[in-house]
């Protein structure tokens, strides 16, 4: 019996901490490292988002300039491309169908 090696149970079960029973319900423990990572502020992200916003604005300006140039060259083509075709006949709304229930209703 002295030669047997005791195997200590690992603190994680299936990569997650074991649940704690409180008030007849099982509640999972939250890891301390996850809480610390969530509250840390990332300063590098703010700088990159400002740069990407400027790049997006410049891209949109270039796009609107090219669309304006095309609109001046081909005004009729651009106008007809954005219009929906008008239907020859308008669809009539179908009558509402009466649902036949073969079982008596609960009152």
Swiss-Prot record:
Expressed in hair follicle, corneal epithelium, epidermis and footpad epithelium (at protein level). Pfam families: DAP. GO terms for molecular function: ribosome binding; translation initiation factor binding; translation repressor activity. GO terms for biological process: apoptotic process; cell differentiation; cell population proliferation; gene expression; negative regulation of CD8-positive, alpha-beta T cell activation; ribosome hibernation. GO terms for cellular component: nucleus. The keyword Nucleus does not apply. Keywords: Apoptosis, Differentiation. The keyword Magnesium does not apply. May play a role in the early stages of epithelial differentiation or in apoptosis. This is Death-associated protein-like 1. It comes from Mus musculus (Mouse). The gene is Dapl1.
